[in-house]
A protein has these predicted regions:
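Phosphate/pyrophosphate-binding loop motifs in nucleotide- or prenyl diphosphate-using proteins
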Residues: 1-149
Length: 149
């Protein structure tokens, strides 16, 4: 990702995709920043994954997280200007992968301690970060800060 900066200082604010200025510490910025963290953790998982299919699935999920982050970084009134959005097809594809993977690997019924492999630990890290992002997004919906998800 190319870094963009103006060298003028931002006084603690950032721009949404439509240009609206919001605090960097605001709940919307926290939500899409959390998705960025999740994508980075999944990037580590992808880089250390042995199977090409695993790398393909993780990359696709990372791209979906970028779409979701873009939706979170867009004010509802600006959403019609952009074509990106997650659809039921994205969710269906994810559910299909889950079913396929569960058919290959039996899930344990008890809690697990992450860390058997670097890739597995990175996936667990990404999973927990995504769950945090979900909680933040639900808060945005409940506060009526977002409506385009």
């Amino acid at each position: 990702m190319a870094m963009k900066f103006s060298k003028k200082g931002d006084k603690g604010f950032t721009s949404l995709l439509g240009g609206q200025r919001v605090p960097k510490s605001g709940p919307r910025t926290e939500a899409y920043g959390t998705l960025d963290e999740a994508s980075s953790a999944l990037g580590l998982a992808r880089a250390s994954a042995r199977k090409a299919k695993t790398r393909e699935i993780i990359l696709s999920i990372q791209k979906d997280l970028l779409l979701l982050g873009a939706e979170l970084a867009t004010a509802p009134e600006d959403a019609p200007k952009y074509e990106y959005q997650l659809t039921p097809q994205h969710v269906g594809r994810l559910e299909q992968w889950i079913e396929e993977l569960q058919a290959e690997v039996a899930l344990k019924s008890e809690f697990i301690c992450p860390g058997e492999t670097v890739s597995g630990a990175a996936i667990d890290l990404g999973r927990t970060i995504v769950r945090r992002a979900e909680r933040k997004a639900v808060g945005l919906l409940q506060q009526k800060i977002i409506s385009n998800l």
